[in-house]
């Protein structure tokens, strides 16, 4: 495992680079996750490809819950719907959703699906919305952590998602929902 240079409690376990995609079985992956849980890791996040290949099967074998990440375009929403069905069929009920690369200007012009449209189609709880942000590319190319960039809208969205996962108060005024009319109305009733 590789320890992150910025966060001492963050580790990365890279996938084996082998041509044989069946080198690790779902049973071995489940055992690895159980071992890591026993080592006192609070969260184990497994990034996996979408689809029915071995990497997906391995990832869900060791998972207690799932987060599906999608973009607001029709083909990605169809894929997300298929993945949600596969997760539920494999016992991972009530997956959460992250909507990535959302552009408010395109939503307002009805050129991109809104979070409400996506939620209506997929019928799962939205964990967070990450806006399109050029800082993502800049941070990636520099090897920086976007979550540390206090000026980045995507970085803020990542931090809000983490707060939600941790069960912390997440009433950030910069979230996408708070900037919409519906979000403003909701906020008025929630605040009192």
Q: Residue locations for each model-derived region?
A:
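A generic structural signal for short coil/turn motifs at secondary-structure boundaries
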Residues: 20-23, 105-107, 147-149
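P-loop NTP-binding site
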Residues: 125, 160-192
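Short helix/strand-capping connector loops at secondary-structure junctions
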Residues: 137-146, 163, 167
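Conserved phosphate/pyrophosphate-binding and hydrolysis machinery centered on Walker-type P-loop NTPases
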Residues: 22, 26, 151, 175
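P-loop/Walker-type NTP enzyme "switch/lid" segment
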Residues: 1-38, 140-142
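Generic hydrophobic alpha-helical segments
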Residues: 28-36, 157, 161, 165, ...
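C-terminal boundary of histidine-terminating zinc-finger modules
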Residues: 142-157
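Conserved catalytic-core segment of NTP-binding enzymes
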Residues: 27, 31-39, 43, 48-141
């Amino acid at each position: 495992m590789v320890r992150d240079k910025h966060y001492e409690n963050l580790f990365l376990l890279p996938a084996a680079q082998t041509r044989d995609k069946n080198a690790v079985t779902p049973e071995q992956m489940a055992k690895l996750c159980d071992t890591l849980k026993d080592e006192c890791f609070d969260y184990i996040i497994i990034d996996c490809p979408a689809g029915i290949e071995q990497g997906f099967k391995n990832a869900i074998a060791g998972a207690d819950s799932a987060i599906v990440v999608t973009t607001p375009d029709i083909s990605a929403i169809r894929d997300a719907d298929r993945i949600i069905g596969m997760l539920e069929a494999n016992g991972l009920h009530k997956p959460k959703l992250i909507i990535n690369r959302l552009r408010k200007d395109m939503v307002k012009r009805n050129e991109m699906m809104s979070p409400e449209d996506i939620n209506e189609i997929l019928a799962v709880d939205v964990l967070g919305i990450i806006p399109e942000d050029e800082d993502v590319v800049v941070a990636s190319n520099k090897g920086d952590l976007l979550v540390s960039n206090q000026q980045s809208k995507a970085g803020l969205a990542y931090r809000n998602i983490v707060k939600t996962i941790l069960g912390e108060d997440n009433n950030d005024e910069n979230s996408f929902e708070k900037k919409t009319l519906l979000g403003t109305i909701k906020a008025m009733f929630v605040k009192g």
